[in-house]
Design a protein with these regions (language model features):
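Active-site bordering "gate/hinge" segments
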Residues: 1, 94, 108, 117, ...
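Long, low-charge, small-residue-enriched segments that form tightly packed helices used
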Residues: 1-172, 282, 523-528
Length: 528
């Protein structure tokens, strides 16, 4: 866009992504004709601070993000920079003091007019600069700079309340290793919070539940015989905390499921990090539960429940149980072999020139779950998941795009994958079917009549219509909700010719492994 005095571009327009080029910086090199040593610049700083009657001057050693206002819309040119490492340099000779919470603010004019001297050792910064035309790489090279006058401000303080309990000791040790160390740290923090987590005049929790999950993941994706990424994550951790106030008859739960706060845990687990994660989240959930309990009491006063429902306890007390389920088979990944499989399967699409966006993706997850509650429910159970997904698209004769996905999942272990020849046949059949859809006419008439369902379509018909809230699954809610199962008591909810049974512990059916089996549920209850 031509400007007054600049009728042609000077070649400074930069862009990344799909934006429009904008004048941007590239390389900035700052030099001085009269360089000084760092010691000389420190003496200048101290001398000027004394002259201005200051007890100290600031030394900014490192800064991080900031923002600028560049005069758009009539605003003043100004900046705000967040220093990372700031020291006070005292004029009386005391050692430099590291401080935090300082922001540097000002305008370019005031800053540049107060630059007094520069150093003799340049430093280089390379990073990314973001603006309306995208993120572009930039480099800045500058020596140390002494500025006689800079305005700073105190960073806005957080309004977070201090935690109820002090943080666990950084030197905490639960002894043991592996599962024993994990349960030991969870147990110590759970007992500490059960005993001491309360504010003055407020109730203590009557129930706590801690969940910790350790997991790692493999992902391999390929297209047309090549691998475009193959990743393996290290072991990672996450968790959850549930805090209940009141008692089993009337508690602070308003959701009746899912009232759990996530726990942030580092990948490197030890007793201290486990305890600290659960300590922080227990405090958060305790304060949340206090608020929720007050809201629930007020709501039930204004909206009393029917006597029969009011008599139901809010929570069932469970017996103590310890169950440690070990992985029946090692979860072993041969990354090279699986990459070769993905290459061969994706290469099959080379014979289908009219198919596009074809790819093959393999995802595998190994996971161990730990749960501990104040009711002495202590559980460990493994989980494995392997999924292979094949997808592609084709342009039909009428110009529309048809996409399809072949999913081979619900596998517990990589060894459960079908043979390469079986997979090749499945992928070839998938591609052939997609090519047939290319020439298939679009149905335009409405139809009411017989239909034949098979494979996944048949099972999906039953799961969607029977195993969902309001069907054969009953959920408790604080307020009446339409379409729930309780509205249908005494009414016909399914065809009498159907028999529905829950085979939770069934490992295999008709020679096919079943992925959903388990011996004990997440609460420690054996399935009926």
């Amino acid at each position: 866009v031509p400007l007054d005095g600049f009728p042609v571009s000077n070649g400074h327009g930069r862009v990344s992504g799909g934006g429009d080029p904008v004048s941007r910086q590239s390389n900035l090199v700052i030099e001085t004709a009269h360089p000084y040593t760092e010691s000389e610049l420190r003496q200048m700083l101290i001398k000027e601070a004394k002259k201005q009657g200051k007890e100290y001057g600031y030394y900014f050693n490192a800064v991080t993000s900031g923002f600028t206002y560049t005069g758009e819309g009539g605003s003043l040119n100004s900046f705000n920079v967040t220093p990372l490492e700031v020291y006070r340099v005292y004029v009386d000779g005391r050692p430099d003091e590291l401080v935090r919470g300082v922001d540097m603010i000002g305008t370019p004019l005031s800053m540049f007019s107060n630059i007094t001297a520069a150093g003799d050792q340049p430093a280089v910064f390379t990073g990314m600069c973001g603006a309306e035309s995208g993120w572009v790489p930039v480099t800045a090279c500058s020596p140390m700079i002494y500025v006689s006058q800079v305005e700073t401000q105190r960073r806005t303080q957080s309004r977070d309340l201090p935690p109820v309990l002090p943080a666990p000791d950084v030197n905490t040790s639960t002894g043991g290793d592996g599962d024993e160390a994990i349960f030991g740290a969870m147990d110590e923090e759970l007992r500490r919070n059960m005993a001491g987590l309360s504010l003055p005049g407020e109730a203590k929790p009557y129930y706590l539940s801690y969940v910790l999950t350790r997991y790692r993941q493999w992902q391999i994706a390929g297209s047309l015989g090549g691998i475009f990424y193959s990743t393996v994550t290290p072991w990672q951790s996450s968790g959850g905390v549930q805090v209940m106030l009141g008692n089993y008859q009337h508690n602070s739960d308003i959701q009746y499921m899912g009232q759990v706060a996530p726990v942030q845990l580092p990948a490197e687990l030890d007793g201290y990090n486990i305890r600290r994660g659960f300590w922080e989240t227990s405090d958060l959930m305790y304060r949340f539960s206090l608020q929720v309990m007050a809201r629930k009491i007020a709501h039930l006063k204004s909206n009393p429940l029917p006597p029969a429902e009011a008599a139901l306890p809010d929570m069932q007390q469970l017996p103590a149980v310890t169950k440690m389920v070990e992985r029946p088979r090692p979860f072993e990944i041969d990354l090279v072999a699986l990459e070769g499989m993905v290459k061969e399967l994706s290469a099959l699409f080379k014979d289908y020139k009219e198919l596009f966006n074809s790819n093959v993706m393999l995802v595998a997850v190994e996971q161990d779950n730990f749960r501990l509650t104040s009711e002495n429910v202590r559980l460990k159970f493994p989980l494995g998941l392997v999924g292979l997904t094949v997808s592609a698209s084709v342009r039909t004769t009428d110009g529309s795009t048809v996409s399809d996905v072949l999913a081979i999942s619900s596998l517990e272990n990589p060894v459960d994958l079908p043979s390469l020849e079986e997979l090749k046949k499945k992928v070839t059949d998938f591609a052939d079917n997609l090519m047939e859809l290319k020439e298939t006419p679009m149905i335009e008439e409405y139809y009411t009549g017989p239909v034949l369902f098979e494979e996944g379509a048949a099972s999906r018909l039953f799961t969607d219509n029977l195993l969902s809230p309001g069907r054969l699954l009953a959920l408790r809610t604080m307020t009446p909700a339409r379409g729930m199962l309780d509205e249908q008591l005494g009414r016909k909810i399914m065809d009498s010719r159907l028999t529905v049974k829950n085979y939770t512990t069934l490992v295999e059916y008709d020679g096919t492994p079943l992925f959903g089996h388990y011996e004990i549920d997440g609460d420690g209850v054996v399935p009926a």
